[in-house]
């Protein structure tokens, strides 16, 4: 199911290059969102997506409600583990919305201080993932994704027990009754509708959760193919900062051709794992190389507004931004 959905998205990207190039501003009054999660809607249509960072509470959320980005990466790995602030941030996004594309909010993906280092660690801390989802966030990025069994526990934490399709290798989900109230209000749907949509995409084609991994150290790198293959995962990155620390090499946020050969090899290995498992690859994009990155296979751009604007024009995006 996952491989089919993402393969179709890649075909869609090639087709967009043949479509007429209409300006985003001309469409903004007529475009009708097809999904809750703007980032998933774009990926499913074969379009790369671009993000910005976020933190704080209500006022910060309201300020970012009109962001240029497709999604906001809300920092909790090294920032405060403050679920009240996160809930207020989401409320601010709603009050400041909708987006230019007509979505109620930009998508919000939260990085966790919980790590994918072992099944036991993830199982003991699955409640952190659940508290994030209770805020109305649209996804989670799990750092140091070393152990496939930990990744399975991560996905379980983001599913209801009766979620479809069933995946025997995952086991049943861990979300419980009562978790649908606040997020359904943030999403602007009923609690019953939320429970149907609160599931990872593309495992569930109708799911609105976007789950990702940071394959960002030598231990995770050794298992890159295995962790990327876990059903329910939609994207991964190679974590050039932490990867450099793990390999005792310089930081890898520079252009690919400037990196140490061992860092280039690590990046290539994560990119290959993403392609093999039909999930999106996240990488830094710059105005001077965003088109090259897209051609290489990057589907999530970490960079500024200028790079995003150029990338959207390059792929002839139809959704307003």
Region annotations inferred by a language model:
Residues 1-7:
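Bacterial N-terminal signal peptides that target proteins for export
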């Amino acid at each position: 199911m996952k491989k089919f959905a993402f393969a179709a998205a890649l075909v869609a990207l090639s087709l967009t290059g043949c479509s007429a190039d209409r300006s985003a501003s001309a469409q903004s009054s007529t475009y009708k969102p097809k999904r809750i999660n703007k980032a998933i809607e774009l990926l499913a249509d074969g379009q790369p997506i671009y993000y910005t960072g976020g933190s704080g509470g209500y006022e910060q959320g309201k300020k970012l409600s009109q962001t240029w980005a497709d999604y906001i990466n809300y920092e909790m790995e090294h920032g405060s583990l403050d679920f009240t602030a996160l809930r207020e941030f989401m409320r601010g996004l709603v009050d400041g919305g909708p987006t230019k594309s007509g979505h109620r909010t930009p998508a919000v993906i939260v990085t966790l201080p919980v790590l994918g280092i072992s099944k036991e660690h993830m199982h003991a801390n699955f409640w952190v993932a659940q508290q994030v989802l209770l805020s109305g966030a649209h996804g989670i990025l799990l750092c140091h994704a070393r152990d496939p069994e930990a990744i399975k526990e991560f996905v379980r934490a983001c599913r209801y027990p009766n979620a479809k399709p069933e995946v025997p290798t995952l086991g049943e989900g861990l979300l419980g009754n009562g978790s649908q109230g606040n997020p359904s209000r943030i999403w602007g749907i009923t609690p019953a509708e939320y429970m149907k949509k609160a599931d990872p995409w593309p495992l569930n084609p109708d799911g609105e959760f976007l789950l990702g991994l940071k394959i960002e150290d030598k231990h995770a790198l050794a298992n890159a193919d295995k962790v990327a293959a876990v059903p329910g995962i939609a994207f991964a990155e190679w974590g050039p900062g932490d990867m450099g620390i793990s390999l005792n090499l310089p930081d890898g946020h520079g252009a690919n051709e400037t990196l140490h050969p061992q860092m280039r090899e690590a990046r290539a290995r994560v990119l290959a794992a993403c392609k093999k498992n039909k999930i999106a690859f996240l990488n830094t994009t710059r105005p001077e190389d965003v088109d090259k990155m897209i051609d290489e296979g990057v589907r999530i751009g970490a960079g500024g507004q200028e790079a995003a604007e150029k990338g959207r024009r390059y792929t002839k995006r139809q959704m307003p931004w």
